[in-house]
Amino acid sequence: MKVTGNASRVVLLVLVLIGGMAQAQPDIERRVAELERKMKLLDPSFVPASELGVLERLQALEVRMDAALSAKAVAPPQQAQALQPVSIAGDFQKAADTETRLPVAGYMDFHVNKEAGDSFRPDFHRFVLLFGHSFSERIKFWSELELEHSLVEGGEESGEVALEQAYLDFLFTPKFNLRAGMLLTPVGIVNERHEPPSFNGVERPFVESIIIPTTWRELGFGFTGDLGRGFRYRTYLTSSLDASRFNAEFGIADGKTSGLDASMRNPAWAGRLEFAGIRRLTVGTSMYSGLAGFNAPGVNPRVTIANVDARYSIRRVDLRGLFANTWVSKAGELNRLLRQQTGVNPNVASQMRGYYFEPALHILPRRYRQDLIAFGRYERYNTQQKMPAGYLPLEQFNRSSWITGIAYKPAPDVALKFDYVFNRNQSAVVKALNGLNLGIGWWF
């Protein structure tokens, strides 16, 4: 693989930044203060854990913020308090005679991408608005409406308006609550928490876009809860994947229905268990299993996904890693059926695998109110890991990527990103192209 002079300078710049600022302390106190303020808006009973160190408080706050957003369906905008319906009784249900305004949140994802030998391509990838409402103390609503690529018109290359989430929470106890509607499938790290400032890199990790579908949502219902001692869970029955859309390059990723013509004839199960009972550490594991014979009459393959992941922070360093494996039963029968229907062999594998590891360093000294993060991520992902009998793997889809870059945060919820991607595959014929990415993202 050839590395251009520009790419070499990019890598050198990042290494110099990391080396030259190795003694700097991360600016996380402002982030902690901001999250504590938002948690107070979400939960008036919240009391900061002042006895913990700053990093421990940040870790605990991120976990509690995720739980609060899911349980209360109230967004954390800076002006959220002023937008809440007000009544003398303090009960949302009794505010019908007043002007009721919904809590509103949102995020934006603007990219400029360039592959080797190609020109720069700007794209307003995502603009998302989130709306929540409390019908009572025990019934909450939450939704996300997403516009992709800035414009919707006829044709396959146009943008898209999509319902990303829309569900009701029925809150019974901290350990047991009912959720129903359009749900994000709880597999991996990024699928449920994908606001641009929450992950490094302009684009989401390849493993969490291909081996695990990205923005994967399905219709369904299930249960959520906080079990105490650092454990929390989500378990859902959802609509199934569509195996007729599986292929060699993206595996099962194109099989998500996103609620359109979804099938519950053979509901799938998805579940996630997380543990954050150790300081600075969050560990999670997810499982998914469901039949996917949807539009493939005569063949009903089962898709099973297992993943483990972990996030750890120590002083100025953040570490993140994930492993995922996908199994597709009856892949050979599926390939033969789809070839009969379309004339093209999709070469769907019976097993797909991916993993990544990412260290990140907070560079700026604590006296600065901004944050500058240098990171590197190695990913290995193979959608042709194991083939059914009679099929050979396509080696161009046995891939690896090195991503190195920086993220500048002038405020905790605003990120300006730059990265360079070194792509490789195992094919001697099809060359993997390197890429350069610039991005701006925010959420409120």
Q: What do the PLM-derived regions correspond to, one by one?
A:
Residues 1-7:
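N-terminal secretory signal peptides that target proteins for export/translocation
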Residues 9-19:
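Bacterial N-terminal signal peptides
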Residues 22-109:
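N-terminal periplasmic/intermembrane-space "pro-region" immediately following the signal or transit peptide
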Residues 91-243, 265-270, 274-282, 351, ...:
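Outer membrane beta-barrel
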Residues 116, 155, 166-170, 191-193, ...:
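Outer-membrane beta-barrel pore domains
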Residues 245, 250-296:
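Loop-centered beta-sheet repeat module
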